[in-house]
Amino acid sequence: MISKPDKNKTRQRRHARVRGKISGTAERPRLNVYRSNKNIYAQVIDDVEGVTLASASTLDSEVKGNNKTEKAASVGEVVAKRAAEKKIVDVVFDRGGYLYHGRVQALAEAARENGLKF
């Protein structure tokens, strides 16, 4: 019997491979993205201390948009502004094993436009 590969399991393996190579520090924290079917979440993480420095998601009241891609761009804007308040400019982008396309790309480009460098 032919079995279909589990996309989320494949994504998790891809993310684990990438996480072995990248890590966030206090000077250059990691911008992590998690995408569910309904929402998208972004965190700026210092992996050395194990602390989240800034975060945003589509569940926040500041996030506006008519569709999921617009909301993802709004999340990128909000997380970039919250990081800027804590004087964070340089980050390492961790796409979480997702393809750089659609909502993940919209979030990343909005974060770049609002001052984050990666």
From Swiss-Prot:
CDD domains, per database record: Ribosomal_L18_L5e
Gene Ontology biological process: translation
MF terms (GO), sorted A to Z: 5S rRNA binding; structural constituent of ribosome
Biased composition (Basic residues): 10-20
Any Pfam family the entry gives: Ribosomal_L18p
A GO term from the CC aspect: cytosolic large ribosomal subunit
Entries under Gene3D superfamilies matching the protein: 3.30.420.100
Residue ranges the record marks as coiled coil: none
Region Disordered, annotated ranges: 1-24
Keywords annotated in UniProt: Ribonucleoprotein, Ribosomal protein, RNA-binding, rRNA-binding
Family: Belongs to the universal ribosomal protein uL18 family.
Subunit comment: Part of the 50S ribosomal subunit; part of the 5S rRNA/L5/L18/L25 subcomplex. Contacts the 5S and 23S rRNAs.
Entry function: This is one of the proteins that bind and probably mediate the attachment of the 5S RNA into the large ribosomal subunit, where it forms part of the central protuberance.
UniProt name for this protein: Large ribosomal subunit protein uL18
Organism: Lactiplantibacillus plantarum (strain ATCC BAA-793 / NCIMB 8826 / WCFS1) (Lactobacillus plantarum)
Lineage: Bacteria, Bacillati, Bacillota, Bacilli, Lactobacillales
Gene this protein is translated from: rplR
